[in-house]
Amino acid sequence: MTVEIANIVGSGDLGVELDVEPLEADLSTPYSEYDPSNYHGLYVRLEENGPLITVYRSGKYIITGCASMESLHETNEEFLGMLADLGVTEEDTQTGFTVENVVCTAMLDELVSLNALAIGLGLEVTEYEPEQFPGLVYRPEEIGAVLLVFANGKMVITGAKDTETAESAYEYFQSKVQELV
């Protein structure tokens, strides 16, 4: 099985402080919500069931829920264009937009005992407390990602900054499992 993207998160900084309450009223999007008694961020969706943008008074924002890098960057560009049209920012505002986290899923080629895996991989790079969490957490220093491995063979790869890192993490882990089996 290949590694599949589950979620991509990116963030940027508009470089200006925002009054988010009137901003919510000015936005013409399918979904926006600002309830400071519940949370201090403004939630925005540019399309129904689309990626979620959380905007803060500081001008910082986070985009979550994208299934591809293309979707993440398109959502960012559309959001910035909308803010420029409202006069909130300049057309060419540099936000330093970066990918923060690529979350992927995959399946192990074969099932293994998580207890045996924790011991084989090394207790210094694994956490496995089945009474607290049903998965094994693997944090190898060699790769830029954290892997969650479950008894049914499903894996979640998180902390990567790009899909290549997630795929490399999967391949690295598969080779480690093969060494142990």
Curated annotation (Swiss-Prot):
GO biological process: DNA-templated transcription initiation
InterPro entries in the record: TBP, TBP_archaea, TBP_dom_sf
Function of the molecule: General factor that plays a role in the activation of archaeal genes transcribed by RNA polymerase. Binds specifically to the TATA box promoter element which lies close to the position of transcription initiation.
Highest taxon of the lineage: Archaea
Stored PANTHER family: TATA-BOX BINDING PROTEIN
Entries under NCBIfam families matching the protein: PRK00394.1-2
Name of this chain's protein: TATA-box-binding protein C
Keyword set includes Flavoprotein: no
Family of the protein in this entry: Belongs to the TBP family.
Sequence repeats: 5-83, 99-177
MF GO annotations: DNA binding; DNA-binding transcription factor activity; general transcription initiation factor activity
A Pfam match: TBP
Entry keywords, A to Z: DNA-binding, Plasmid, Repeat, Transcription, Transcription regulation
